[in-house]
């Protein structure tokens, strides 16, 4: 049975334009061992904001039971979440969903991690786990602008890291695909998370390879009951086969679902 826990905020700060890093501690953090999973956060106990907010897991410190969450404060709920201070508690449901398959890559092989915007955070925990497994990691991160970018130094400590910004204020001007076109990157497995247009480009480029995408989607319940986050299965002409992003995903092999 999925359970919730009121976790205590140990650190909460803005790390980029509209991007916040929140660290919390709780007993259930020890169960959050699969990179790519997410948690559902209840912003407050009032009746005004009923739905929980899905936030991807950025990092887990198993020794201290500390969970790191990165999110963009853009809606009413996340803006209110951004006002919470150290010492306060937040109601968290999780871990939820299916994470990135670590078994898809062997020790000594190279993983290519491709992230865009708020799809970057879950790749950090993935990169750390891959590094601990003995894999090599290459990171390609995309942002709108330098002021929106974050965690470059953290990713760089784990492997070669490239950055692309739409306005050219940091790294390569353009999208992550521009970096992929310019650099002769050698890899064995691809893991990606980001906005749908980026995932479409990644899927078209790496179809038929060992490649996996994590989808960003608004979710109602987070446990597969409300059917608010379904996506169709590739090749289903009748359109009756689907996957629930919250429980079957958010991670899928490239080509399995329609983007």
UniProtKB/Swiss-Prot annotation:
Keyword ATP-binding on entry: no
Biological or metabolic pathway of the protein: Pyrimidine metabolism; UMP biosynthesis via de novo pathway; orotate from (S)-dihydroorotate (NAD(+) route): step 1/1
Record-listed [2Fe-2S] cluster binding positions: 221, 226, 229, 246
Binding site for FAD: 53-56, 70-72, 77-78
Stored Gene3D superfamilies: Dihydroorotate dehydrogenase, electron transfer subunit, Nucleotide-binding domain of ferredoxin-NADP reductase (FNR) module, Translation factors
GO BP terms, alphabetized: 'de novo' UMP biosynthetic process
Domain FAD-binding FR-type: 2-102
Family from the record: Belongs to the PyrK family.
Assembly mode: Heterotetramer of 2 PyrK and 2 PyrD type B subunits.
Physiological role: Responsible for channeling the electrons from the oxidation of dihydroorotate from the FMN redox center in the PyrD type B subunit to the ultimate electron acceptor NAD(+).
HAMAP family in the record: DHODB_Fe_S_bind
Name assigned to this protein: Dihydroorotate dehydrogenase B (NAD(+)), electron transfer subunit
């Amino acid at each position: 049975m999925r359970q919730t826990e009121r976790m205590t905020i140990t650190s909460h700060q803005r790390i980029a334009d509209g991007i916040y890093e929140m660290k919390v501690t709780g007993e259930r953090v020890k169960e959050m061992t699969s990179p790519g999973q997410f948690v559902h956060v209840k912003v407050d106990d009032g009746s005004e904001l009923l739905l929980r907010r899905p936030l991807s897991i950025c990092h887990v410190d198993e020794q201290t039971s500390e969970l790191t969450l990165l999110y963009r404060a853009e809606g009413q709920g996340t803006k209110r979440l951004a006002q919470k201070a150290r010492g306060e508690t937040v109601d968290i449901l999780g871990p939820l969903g299916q994470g990135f398959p670590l078994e898809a890559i062997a020790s000594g092989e190279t993983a290519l991690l491709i992230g865009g915007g708020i799809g970057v955070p879950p790749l950090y925990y993935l990169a750390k786990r891959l590094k601990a497994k003995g894999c090599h990691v290459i990171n390609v991160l995309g942002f709108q602008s330098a002021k929106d970018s974050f965690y470059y130094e953290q990713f760089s400590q784990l492997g070669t890291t490239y950055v692309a910004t739409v306005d050219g204020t940091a790294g390569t001007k353009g999208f992550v695909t521009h970096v992929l076109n310019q650099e002769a990157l050698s890899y064995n497995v691809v893991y990606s998370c980001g906005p749908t247009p980026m995932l479409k480009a990644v899927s078209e480029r790496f179809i038929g390879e060992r490649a996996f995408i994590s989808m960003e989607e608004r979710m109602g319940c987070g446990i597969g009951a409300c059917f608010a986050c379904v996506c169709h299965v590739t090749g289903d002409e009748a359109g009756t086969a689907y996957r629930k992003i919250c429980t079957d995903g958010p991670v899928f092999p490239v080509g399995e679902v329609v983007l």
